[in-house]
Amino acid sequence: MQEQYNPQQIEQAAQSFWDENKVFKAIADSSKEKFYCLSMFPYPSGRLHMGHVRNYTIGDVISRYQRMQGKNVLQPMGWDAFGLPAENAAIKHKTAPAKWTTENIAYMKGQLKELGFGYDWDREIATCTPEYYKWEQWFFTQLVEKGLAYKKTAAVNWCPEDQTVLANEQVEDGCCWRCGTNVEKKEISQWFIRITDYAEELLNDLDQLDGWPEKVKAMQRNWIGRSEGLEFSFAVEGKDERLSVYTTRPDTIMGVTYVAVATQHPLSLEASANNADLAAFIEESKKMSTTEADMATVEKKGMDTGFKAIHPITGEAVPVYAANFVLMDYGSGAVMSVPAHDQRDFEFAKKYNLAIKQVVQPAGDEVIDLEKAAFTEKGVLCNSGEFDGLAFKEAFDAIAAWMVERNLGEVKVNYRLRDWGVSRQRYWGTPIPTINLKDGSVVPVPQDQLPVELPTDVIMDGVNSPIKNNPDFSSIMFNGEEAERETDTFDTFMESSWYFARYCCPDSTDAMLTEEANYWLPVDQYVGGVEHAILHLLYSRFFHKLLRDAGLVNSDEPFKRLLTQGMVNKDGTKMSKSKGNTVDPQEMIEKYGADTVRLFMMFSAPPEQSLEWNDAGVDGASRFLRRLWALSYRHTNAGKVGELNIAELNGAQKALRRKTHETIQKVSDDIERRQTFNTAIAAVMELCNEISKFEDSSELGLAVEQEALEAATLLLSPIVPHIAHQLWSELGHSDNIVNTPWPTLDEEALIKDELTIVVQVLGKKRAELTVSANADNKTIEAEALAHPSVAKLLEGKTVRKVIVVPGRLVNIVAN
């Protein structure tokens, strides 16, 4: 064994061994218990960042640990390769997105290998390959035929100068990022998938996910947003149509003083035909961002349409306002407004001098001032005619019954969740496999014509998608007639919503998924950032249920256990290029070696918390590995290792062996159950401290030390696999440590022959006793009283009481 630890040499040797022997190749075997560990695949941006390193190290540690538990482990890796950043980079670097993406994948794959991650590279997928997206296209055509995918008009960001659609990221302060023109909202026809059909199941099945963080489940529950309420309608004075609204607060219906409708609502548009100011307001509203965050903070504006809505219970006529905070694609595009009991409605009413009518009062003695703010709590009805005096639940039921009885409304369950809009007016994505016929109808591309391949030899002009104006792509013959391909591409969340399943059978050419998928699925452990808590994880859960209902998978949920790792910070903030506080993983690997980087990542913080990058901490991790190497070097040069004869162990040997097995017990629990890898590492460091203090070069002493070093090496091998690979060999083993069983706990080794007992006199520590673990209370009491320090203190005093706490202390009361 060489004396000095040389990480670069050791790591290259270990990685070559793993590659040449295909150590991490996963083969389905029904006789073995499987474990599918998956980390969220990266976007191939060009280089790994420290967030990637943390994510993938956590996943690799779990995978290697489970392999040592004897499980058949699948840990794949691939590339979330489509998306807008590739288009932008291609424009900047004057290249094609495909070329840029392919080069990035090659470089980043090399980085992942240098970090020693145990991936089955034979299962590698890139979502931009036709072999992958063919099956996404095929599945979408199935959804179209089942009616689960449909087209409707929806608003997009539109640049009138460039005549192109912009992603939300391309709108800066309401202007086009490229030309600075004011961005407008434009209604265009787009594809949607009916995720709302699965809303109830998506909500209820969260209760099955015991291995998910509660905060993630809470975020999904809120996003799905189940509510029970009353749907009813207002007649419109002088018109046949009615205004349908939904409310979760039927108890406040008697306080409606106006109805707000979307600026794109038919009533708004009709009124604007003869009202130039209203028409201008509607045009202004088109430029607004409709993201939830922006809608929450935008100044609430409105204009009277001149129409009146007739209150269904009182018959009172109330004004109908076009309002910029009501969205046409949310519900019916109309909301009842109760300014006395809703703060947004209150502020709007104050602004436009609309009536404020109190219909709910506090149940207790609370005094409210409706001149200052709305009273939004539940209470008791007032000013509500026959419903006066009713509390919320009774009022809900009574008013709902009144409406239902007269066929004016119905009790409904509503969801905040909207159907998933999957159309993107971008180039670098999966072509949507549909054909637009001359008669206006739309048909899915026949299966034998899939995949619809995305042309990759393109020039990006920064304005239009290269396939929009490319007749070679868009113009086709269908059933002997001229037709046009759809030139939109899929939202890239489509690719990431089923990739976990395709890893199970990446080479299948005649089916989206094979039976092998049911061997591996569901994923046993998923690792990724909490920023994906809603969209990616919700869409993946939805897609998995679609796959199940198509007979392609047997399970209800895709991910059994979820670990959401924290961010990597430097100088107190998240690492980012714009802040200039990034650390290049490549530089750290070259300076310290991959094992040091991995060890620092796992030791510096619990996985779900943010990690603060610290150069001193990295140095500390490096020092520990050199120390571990030095301990092994000392041991291998100390002499002959004898048989581990437990019956002959002396006190010091028993103590080190006890520490070894205490460490095995703690590390096993920390990794398996608690997933607190930092405390697991701390425990092994403590063991190494005890090994360094153990100076017994007898054959039996070296046998105890050998067991301790083997345990330390095995326990650390998932975290620092390269040095562990080498040390295992140096400790005399010819087998591959990757497949070596996890160390077995010897419960007998934990039993102590002797105990240290604290002796207190009048509550103060005065001495320590070493007693047999089997000593009874009388023996312990006698030894405590006989201890020289204690006996001296008790001279001339009367012992009133002796309290023995077994295994811990003796307290003597005397005066």
UniProtKB/Swiss-Prot annotation:
A motif ('KMSKS' region) lies at residues 574-578. This is Leucine--tRNA ligase. HAMAP family: Leu_tRNA_synth_B. Belongs to the class-I aminoacyl-tRNA synthetase family. ATP binds at residue 577. SUPFAM superfamilies: Anticodon-binding domain of a subclass of class I aminoacyl-tRNA synthetases, Nucleotidylyl transferase, ValRS/IleRS/LeuRS editing domain. Its EC number is 6.1.1.4. One of its GO terms (biological process) is leucyl-tRNA aminoacylation. It is found in: Cytoplasm. It is an enzyme of class 6 (ligase). PANTHER family: LEUCINE--TRNA LIGASE, MITOCHONDRIAL (PTHR43740:SF2), LEUCYL-TRNA SYNTHETASE (PTHR43740). Pfam families: Anticodon_1, tRNA-synt_1, tRNA-synt_1_2, tRNA-synt_1g. Keywords: Aminoacyl-tRNA synthetase, ATP-binding, Cytoplasm, Ligase, Nucleotide-binding, Protein biosynthesis. A motif ('HIGH' region) lies at residues 42-52. One of its GO terms (molecular function) is ATP binding. It catalyses: tRNA(Leu) + L-leucine + ATP = L-leucyl-tRNA(Leu) + AMP + diphosphate. GO terms for cellular component: cytosol. Disulfide bonds: none annotated.
